[in-house]
From Swiss-Prot:
It comes from the Bacteria. This is NAD(P)H-quinone oxidoreductase subunit H. The keyword Cell membrane does not apply. Belongs to the complex I 49 kDa subunit family. It is found in: Cellular thylakoid membrane. It comes from Synechococcus sp. (strain CC9902). It is a peripheral membrane protein. The keyword S-adenosyl-L-methionine does not apply. Pfam families: Complex1_49kDa. One of its GO terms (biological process) is photosynthesis, light reaction. Keywords: Membrane, NAD, NADP, Plastoquinone, Quinone, Thylakoid, Translocase, Transport. GO terms for molecular function: NAD binding; oxidoreductase activity, acting on NAD(P)H, quinone or similar compound as acceptor; quinone binding. NDH-1 shuttles electrons from an unknown electron donor, via FMN and iron-sulfur (Fe-S) centers, to quinones in the respiratory and/or the photosynthetic chain. The immediate electron acceptor for the enzyme in this species is believed to be plastoquinone. Couples the redox reaction to proton translocation, and thus conserves the redox energy in a proton gradient. Cyanobacterial NDH-1 also plays a role in inorganic carbon-concentration. Its EC number is 7.1.1.-.
Length: 394
């Protein structure tokens, strides 16, 4: 008796670019054999706005408001790296107080970034409730940003060459401490809701596993790299700003799956709270109201009027010329390594301004880890990468 052989023709399916689980205008051309993913081709570029070319036709001060439109969840990180590049090329010193203020803003942005990743990721795998909780927490961070910069989500326009645009307002540090005290139990609440939830764990454990060597070879960074057993964090490696002043640990895991990436980001929020608390206590000059009172009482010769107690080294003129030379500078954002390659030619605008977006590099491994998985796993694996298409397409 002859046995009939079942044959299935491969089917090509388009996910996106308008699918709600695509996290922006990403299109995936997926080849399926039944429910198994045979191949996947990401199609990007739908959100290309020519950011690098815009940067090459603007002065640094003019370009800073643009950059938060690339990644609306990491606006402060892009502002920081865009001012760090000309600072290093022109050897402009940054006062200690300004560096602490920058760290406060960056760590608040890291928490906000991870929260905005957490809600949609859980919604992708079927847990709807935490999606509403994360916006409650982000609202507190928005309030802190609004008090310091005047804007909430994007377009903060706060970082400047040599420091920041303005000192912290009165009472800001106390409000930041209140946020830390309020948010710490909320992370425990997330852990109770999610981490040991058997449905959630069965859904994502062992999914989208990336080996250590693959993570390095594909040039992954951030939680994608650290979840695969590589404790690499640019805050420890490059010693930029004043991160060496604080006591904190790099969050990393060995498994390399979606669950490991989730755990890394949860732990990073805890570490960011540790850094925020220490920065609030250790900032040179203390709260702005105390610093201003000390300057007023002690006069011009006051220690509080010294360089390290300023919020900016020297306000850079609109005619500031980027010196001849080239350099690459980078920092650790919530998604990984973001960097700028800057080439100056002694002009007010740069000759070349190349932006390295972390999620752009991290997205490249998606076809490699999707093969062999089920079609229902595509959303969970893509969600664990943390992609925002504004910075991928630039």
């Amino acid at each position: 008796m002859t046995q009939l052989e079942t044959r299935t023709e491969p089917m090509v399916v388009n996910f996106g670019p308008h699918h709600p689980s695509m996290h922006g205008v990403l299109r995936l051309v997926v080849t399926l054999d039944g429910e198994d993913v045979v191949d996947c081709e990401p199609v990007i570029g739908y959100l290309h706005r020519g950011m690098e070319k815009i940067a090459e036709n603007r002065t640094n001060v003019m370009f800073v408001p643009y950059v938060s439109r690339m990644d609306y969840a990491a606006g402060m990180f892009y502002e920081a790296v865009v001012v760090n590049a000309p600072e290093k090329l022109a050897n402009i010193p940054v006062p200690k107080r300004a560096s602490y203020i920058r760290v406060l803003m960056l760590e608040l942005n890291r928490i906000a970034n991870h929260l905005l990743w957490l809600g949609p990721f859980l919604a992708d795998v079927g847990a709807q409730t935490p999606f509403f909780y994360i916006f409650r927490e982000r609202e507190m961070i928005y309030d802190l940003w609004e008090a310091a910069t005047g804007q909430r989500l994007i377009n903060n326009n706060y970082f400047r060459i040599g420091g920041v645009a303005a000192d912290l307002p009165w009472g800001w540090l106390e409000k930041c401490r209140d946020f830390c005290d309020w948010f710490a139990p909320k992370i425990d609440e997330y852990e109770k809701l999610i981490t040991n939830n058997p449905i959630f764990r069965r859904r994502i454990e062992g999914l989208g596993t990336i080996e250590t060597k693959d993570a390095i070879n594909w040039s992954l960074s951030g939680p994608m790299l650290r979840a695969s057993g590589v404790p690499w964090d640019l805050r420890k490696v490059d010693h930029y700003e004043c991160y060496d002043d604080f006591d904190w640990q790099v969050a990393w895991e060995k498994e390399g799956d979606c669950f490991a990436r989730y755990r890394v980001r949860i732990e990073e929020m805890r570490q960011s709270l540790k850094i925020l608390r220490q920065a609030c206590d250790m900032i040179p000059g203390g709260p702005t109201e105390n610093l201003e009172a000390k300057r007023l009482n002690e006069g011009k010769g006051s220690e509080a009027a010294g360089f390290d107690f300023q919020y900016v080294a020297k306000k850079v003129a609109p005619t500031f010329k980027i010196p001849n030379g080239e350099l690459y500078t980078r920092l650790e954002s919530g998604k990984g390594e973001i960097g700028v390659f800057l080439q100056g030619n002694n002009d007010v605008t740069p000759w070349r301004f190349k932006i390295r977006a972390a999620d752009s590099n991290n997205l490249q491994i998606l076809p490699h880890i999707l093969k062999g998985h089920k079609v229902a796993d595509i959303m969970a694996i893509l969600g664990s990468i943390d992609v925002i298409m504004g910075s991928v397409d630039r």
